[in-house]
Amino acid sequence: MANYHRIDTCNVTDGPGCRAVIWFSGCPFHCKGCFSPQTWHPKSGQLYDKQAREEMIKALEEPYCAGLTLLGGEPLAPYNIAEAYDLAVEAKKLGKTVWCYTGNTYEHIQDLDIMKYIDVLVDGPFIISKFNSNLKWRGSANQRVIDVQASLAAGTVVLHPDSNTVDKFYPEKAYDPCADMTPGEIKAKYLDIYE
């Protein structure tokens, strides 16, 4: 059973729209400059149990949720892939998109069963000497934002059409759960946990 570090039920930075995101524990790459080195050890964080799975599924069922993003650590590591696969299958059943960030390259993992459920793969290790804060959805220039289904069909890597543009929000794909709420209702529903 996998471990994970964090679940975010409405993340807007790791793929388009509001996304259910999980940071799996364990990573064999240990990239210099990694933004989440606390996830490197496979037994760090907490056990990905039935409750964690239910939290992710519930987040994916929300109408404002555009999809699932698998992060880490390394979501495709042998000790994480069964849980990552399960979440990807559930997300697709709900009509959601699936994004996955991996230190592997597409060519190395293209034959994994999970790939038929992944829409977009951000591949390759983070290389600090190739860091560029202007890149969309990735941190270093060697990483690629790949349209997985188009790549599988073409037999070669097909980049996501929006991978080299400046980051933007996708209002046509997102639902604002607070649009019809008063500031008091928003505070009561979402912010009281901080008081």
Regions found by a protein language model. Name each.
Residues M1-W23, S36-K43, V157, D162-N164, ...:
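N-terminal [4Fe-4S]-dependent radical SAM core
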Residues A2-R6, C18, S36-C100, Y106-I114:
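Conserved Radical SAM active-site core
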Residues R19-C34, E74:
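Cysteine-centered iron-sulfur cluster-binding motifs in ferredoxin-type domains/subunits
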Residues L76-A84, A88-K92, F131-M181:
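P-loop/Walker A phosphate-binding loop and immediately adjacent motor/lid segment at beta-alpha junctions
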Residues D113-K116, G139:
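Short, conserved loop/helix-junction motifs that constitute active-site signature segments
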Residues D119:
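Receiver (REC) domain switch/active-site residues of two-component response regulators
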Residues P125-I128:
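Short, acidic/turn-prone active-site loops that include or flank metal/cofactor-
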